[in-house]
Curated annotation (Swiss-Prot):
The protein's name in its UniProt record: Serpin H1
Keywords, in A-Z order: Chaperone, Endoplasmic reticulum, Glycoprotein, Signal, Stress response
Family note: Belongs to the serpin family.
Record's function text: Binds specifically to collagen. Could be involved as a chaperone in the biosynthetic pathway of collagen.
Glycan attachment residues as annotated in the record: N107, N112
Primary location group: endoplasmic reticulum
Pfam families reported in the protein's UniProt record: Serpin
Marked site (Reactive bond homolog) residue numbers: R364, N365
Location(s) in or outside the cell: Endoplasmic reticulum lumen
SMART domains associated with the record: SERPIN (SM00093)
One GO-annotated biological process of the protein: collagen fibril organization
Length: 405
């Protein structure tokens, strides 16, 4: 039997929880496990020599693993939990914890960001979804169930891509151009995220600059500039800079990690783990920083199947071993693809800034953070301490400017 599962997470937060509402131990635990997943999966992907830009939402990938666990049995289910470092937790704990975490972090109203997330399950015309699976998957991961005829591949792909575009208000026009295997389960995450800065960039402080993809290849990008007080650390030993920019409502922030000079990110990526992030955070101090960032319109679609397999999800993707029988009651499904598609934009938009700050002593002699070459970034949620997105910008959109020798 063939089934096509399109998973993203749209409208998970139906109500706005109070900012001081305490998370349950379940949600806190799953937030912690999703952070571990963030670094594990990022490193697995960064090993791919053909990979350029990376854009992941660890909490959304965690929900995909939760869904595999929900629809699987025996080792198929336990491996999904193990990749999430949740194999010691019972099923109800995992599903309810993820549900609460996702409802919290996807509350874009409370966080004053734009986060479009959608959720759909496609199956063939012949499938009968198990009632318990439909009920529990909707309860915990909030997605609809639909059927699709993949005998007409062109029409099916068009339907999936149009759904993704509609879900993201046209920001994500395409999830995939093709699906090679059409006899297995297909997971697709589709989302659009746009941060709203705590202090905006002035719209007139934008000009065209060069972004050095490599020392010999430069593209033109719109670069925006502002000076403000930010948490900042200059790691002289590792020859890199770390800066944290709060987003509106200060419930989340963007962290940028950039080597001092243009170079492959491999050296910096080898340093990247949660303990190193804590170390950098402990050394950051609020000070004046002159920041130049490219305006970003980033659209990335990853097939995570291989990378999740590298982390231990091997049985669900094996046609001869997978047991996803809780989805339909039949043991003839396997996971053929895990597409994780996201669009990310940031520009000058944000809250008004206090112009009086520029006369203060503390604003003198700002540090320079000039992001004109590849860097790593994270979007971190302050309440749950989870990483909403992790990625790297290696090749932004832009026309080639020149070759350099």
């Amino acid at each position: 039997m063939q089934i096509f599962l399109v998973l993203a997470l749209c409208g998970l937060a139906a109500a706005v929880p109070s900012e001081d509402r305490k998370l349950s131990d379940k949600a806190t635990t799953l937030a912690d496990r999703s952070t571990t997943l963030a670094f594990n999966l990022y490193h697995a992907m960064a090993k791919d020599k053909n990979m350029e830009n990376i854009l992941l939402s660890p909490v959304v990938v965690a929900s995909s693993l939760g869904l595999v666990s929900l629809g699987g049995k025996a080792t198929t289910a336990s491996q999904a939990k193990a990749v999430l470092s949740a194999d010691k937790l019972n099923d109800d704990y995992v599903h309810s914890g993820l549900s609460e975490l996702l409802n919290e972090v996807s509350n874009s109203t409370a966080r004053n960001v734009t986060w479009k997330i959608g959720n759909r399950l496609y199956g063939p015309a012949s499938i009968n979804f198990a009632d318990d699976f439909v009920k529990n998957s909707k309860k915990h991961y909030n997605y609809e169930h639909s059927k699709i005829n993949f005998r007409d591949k062109r029409s099916a792909l068009k339907s999936i891509n149009e759904w993704a575009a509609q879900t993201t208000d046209g920001k994500l026009p395409e999830v995939t151009k093709d699906v090679e295997k059409t006899d297995g389960a297909l997971i697709v995450n589709a989302m659009f995220f746009k941060p709203h800065w705590d202090e905006k960039f002035h719209h007139k402080m934008v000009d065209n600059r060069g972004f050095m993809v490599t020392r010999s290849y430069t593209v033109g990008v719109p670069m925006m500039h502002r000076t403000g007080l930010y948490n900042y650390y200059d790691d002289e030993a590792e020859k890199l800079q770390v800066v944290e920019m709060p987003l509106a409502h200060k419930l989340s922030s963007m962290i940028f990690i950039m080597p001092n000079h243009v170079e492959p990110l491999e050296r910096v990526e080898k340093l990247l783990n949660r303990e190193q992030l804590k170390t950098w955070a402990s050394k950051m101090k609020k000070r004046s920083v002159a920041i130049s960032l490219p305006k970003v319109v980033l659209e990335v679609s990853h097939d995570l199947q291989k990378h999740l397999a590298d982390l231990g999800l091997t049985e669900a993707i094996d046609k001869t071993k997978a047991d996803l029988s809780k989805i339909s009651g039949k043991k003839d499904l396997y996971l053929s693809n895990v597409f994780h598609a996201a669009a990310l934009e940031w520009d000058t938009d944000g809250n008004p800034y206090d112009a009086d700050i520029y006369g203060r002593e503390e604003m003198r002699n700002p540090k320079l953070f000039y992001a004109d070459h590849p860097f790593i970034f994270m979007i971190k949620d302050s309440k749950t301490n989870s990483i909403l997105f992790i990625g790297r910008l290696v090749r932004p959109k832009g026309d080639k400017m020149r070759d350099e020798l």
